[in-house]
Regions:
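Register-specific beta-strand positions within repetitive beta-rich fiber domains
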Residues: 1-19
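Extracellular receptor-binding modules and their adjoining Ser/Thr/Gly/Asp/Asn-rich linkers
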Residues: 14-74, 81-84, 95-129
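Short linear functional motifs in flexible/disordered or boundary regions
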Residues: 77-78, 88
């Protein structure tokens, strides 16, 4: 048990045989006005609620998430938690940069959709060395 400080492994692996890997530095933000507006949330995990502005059938929209904890070599994962009917929306991280990442949200349905979509994300720190 580590109650304070860091754990550094210089060789070998860290294996989670049973249990979960929890990222508990989280936050939440709600987008305003339209689904193309950026948001700012500097946490390693979080929840973004989009506006309920209409998104036409088959259309995608990209918005920026400003996050001071993100670096260019990090991996950011996003998924749709809820909003609309299952399978109606798809979310993907399309760009990662120092201090931000972009999420592209696509309406996969055959009609316009006006849902407040809830997206969950997590940042995994990476390196290029």
């Amino acid at each position: 048990t580590i109650t304070a400080g860091d754990l550094t492994v210089t060789a070998g692996n860290i294996d989670v045989v049973a249990g979960t890997l929890d990222v508990q530095d989280g936050g939440a933000i709600t987008q305003v006005t339209n689904k193309g507006n950026g948001v700012s949330l500097s946490t390693y995990s979080g929840q973004i609620t989009t506006t309920n502005a209409a998104l036409a059938a088959g259309v995608e929209v990209t918005f920026i998430v400003t996050n001071t904890l993100v670096a260019i070599n990090d991996v950011v994962i996003v998924n749709v938690q809820s909003g609309g009917t299952p399978g109606e929306y798809m979310a993907a991280v399309t760009t990662v940069a120092n201090g931000s990442f972009h999420i592209t949200l696509t309406n996969l349905s055959g009609s316009s959709a006006s849902d407040a979509v809830i997206l969950n994300f997590v940042v995994i720190k990476g390196a290029a060395s």
